[in-house]
């Protein structure tokens, strides 16, 4: 598969990558609203921001689960590629740096692409975005992960609902299974049937399991009602 590695010249992590001498695809757009669509899959490196400023390496898919948008379109998810994201996450976990490595729930744009997009990010402030050692370790691990996409084991292909934005559960499940879209608890009450279905259908690999994390009975019932429209989906509650 033709997987394109991309950075933006408007992003500080992209600037660091360019300074380090990597020759990837270069865009001059906001990473949350870019229109680049070459190749069969896109991995875009970018900064991750958080008020806590905790150093972190994160991966996630783009998508806006509700009417609220940050780039892209409302109520539209990008295309997931569970094998690729999981391969990247597993390699990131091997990086020998005292830094948090985690999967984030699906959020922000872009949502225009007809190919999968995966964000690989450095957090959480300029100290880390411009740190050559951290950025190089992340980029090199991502390059290694691409060579392993077709080799990794996936017990299940999982989509998820619930839990916090930084998901320890799905980060852990990625040790054995491959992870698609994860919708955090913050969006659950804003979901409509269309978005719930997209968590299953918008995926390169066929999703065969849904994990529901710490939701109340009313929220579970609504998700299950939507999922019943699809066949052969195993549902697990945590």
From Swiss-Prot:
D-aminoacyl-tRNA deacylase with broad substrate specificity. By recycling D-aminoacyl-tRNA to D-amino acids and free tRNA molecules, this enzyme counteracts the toxicity associated with the formation of D-aminoacyl-tRNA entities in vivo. Catalyzes the hydrolysis of D-tyrosyl-tRNA(Tyr). It comes from the Archaea. Disulfide bonds: none annotated. NCBIfam families: PRK03995.1-1. The keyword Metal-binding applies. Binds 2 Zn(2+) ions per subunit. Belongs to the DtdA deacylase family. GO terms for molecular function: D-aminoacyl-tRNA deacylase activity; D-tyrosyl-tRNA(Tyr) deacylase activity; zinc ion binding. Its EC number is 3.1.1.96. Monomer. Its cofactor is Zn(2+). GO terms for biological process: D-amino acid catabolic process. InterPro entries: Deacylase_DtdA_archaea (IPR018033), DtdA (IPR007508). This is D-aminoacyl-tRNA deacylase. It catalyses: a D-aminoacyl-tRNA + H2O = a tRNA + a D-alpha-amino acid + H(+); glycyl-tRNA(Ala) + H2O = tRNA(Ala) + glycine + H(+); D-tyrosyl-tRNA(Tyr) + H2O = D-tyrosine + tRNA(Tyr). Keywords: Hydrolase, Metal-binding, Zinc.
